[in-house]
């Protein structure tokens, strides 16, 4: 949502080599209310609770039913990515190139520069992610940087300095470029790095296409009628990141968890992060005419769009926010269970980023739910403390 002034650099600094990114649904399971029932099983057939606010406000809701259309659509992608990873692991080896060596472009030294620049961009825009990649193997680290840069550039299309010029056609062109790079025909050096990454790791193109789809939504959609609609949006712009990065970060060889369950946890982390982003930015978004909150849940809480634009913290608002925060925390909890199944070097950065983001929810509470005019943030001391604590926890999990 926010844009960055140095973003233009992502578009201009790159020399052109040719000369010129279920249902976890967290099973959104009211475990605090359904004591004595089976623990959460990721990807079961139980329907996620679409309105966690209900969990706060009302009696237990029976949630066992079929997946919604949004959940089905997302679940398909999870299954597809999990299958790709399993196939790569069992048949070809996770490090084998996707297409025949002779078809691949020989980027030679350029590729080294391309990855290096991706690292610089990641370091500049996302210091914590960057720091987190330092323990990974060089191959994995470079690959996460390349994915990061592609995601950042995609977001900058609709949120950056040139966003007013972005049309659905421009996003179609960006998607064509994505297809090209997946087929070994990168357009610029950042694309070349990602092209190399997807040739080495079993990364499916669908989450990348879906992130572009999320950006398409941002071009015309500024209201979400239900959590189901919002869930799909969060999957598009953030859940996808989990599906893109786990094939690179790797699942622990001794993990007994199913590939699919680890992917569901990764998806949960993206959703949790985006729900947190949304709750933090309610005021900022409303000033841009946007409301990324489920309108039906707002109405159930006795709140209207006008209440959001007015931006007054009332008891109704506090109650509504408590429900939204609870839901985001459930997604974080779901994600946290998956961390232990990642390759050991990847656990620390993921846990650290999870804790840092989750603390934003604590900050919203500390601000007495005033997310209209106060920006919730995690102070530097807390940030710094999270890193060694996450490191110690991740080490214990190995
Ligand atoms: C098993 C398990 C738990 C695995 C973990 C899997 C994993 C690493 C998941 C990553 C989840 C994650 C970091 C999601 C990103 C969510 C996010 C911040 C999305 C942002 C979307 C739109 O935001 P908006 O415009 O509303 O807000 P801004 O004001 O613009 O911030 C994004 C901006 C989309 C673009 C996403 C990125 C640029 C971040 C991509 C990050 C990576 C590829 C690095 C992940 C690596 C590590 C080490 C955690
Ligand atoms: Mn953005």
Curated annotation (Swiss-Prot):
One of its GO terms (cellular component) is chloroplast membrane. Induction: Induced by salt stress and abscisic acid (ABA) in roots. It catalyses: 2 (2E,6E,10E)-geranylgeranyl diphosphate = 15-cis-phytoene + 2 diphosphate. SUPFAM superfamilies: Terpenoid synthases. InterPro entries: Isoprenoid_synthase_dom_sf, Squ/phyt_synthse, Squalene/phytoene_synthase_CS, Trans_IPPS_bact-type, Trans_IPPS_HH. Its EC number is 2.5.1.32. GO terms for molecular function: 15-cis-phytoene synthase activity; geranylgeranyl diphosphate synthase activity; squalene synthase [NAD(P)H] activity. It is a peripheral membrane protein. Expressed in leaves and endosperm. Expressed in developing leaves. Residues 1-80 form a transit peptide. The keyword Transcription regulation does not apply. Keywords: Carotenoid biosynthesis, Chloroplast, Isoprene biosynthesis, Membrane, Plastid, Transferase, Transit peptide. The keyword Glycoprotein does not apply. GO terms for biological process: carotenoid biosynthetic process. Its main location: plastid. Gene3D superfamilies: Farnesyl Diphosphate Synthase (1.10.600.10). It is found in: Plastid, Chloroplast membrane; Plastid, Chloroplast, Plastoglobule. Catalyzes the conversion of geranylgeranyl diphosphate to phytoene. Mediates the first committed step in carotenoid biosynthesis. Belongs to the phytoene/squalene synthase family. This is Phytoene synthase 2, chloroplastic. The gene is PSY2.
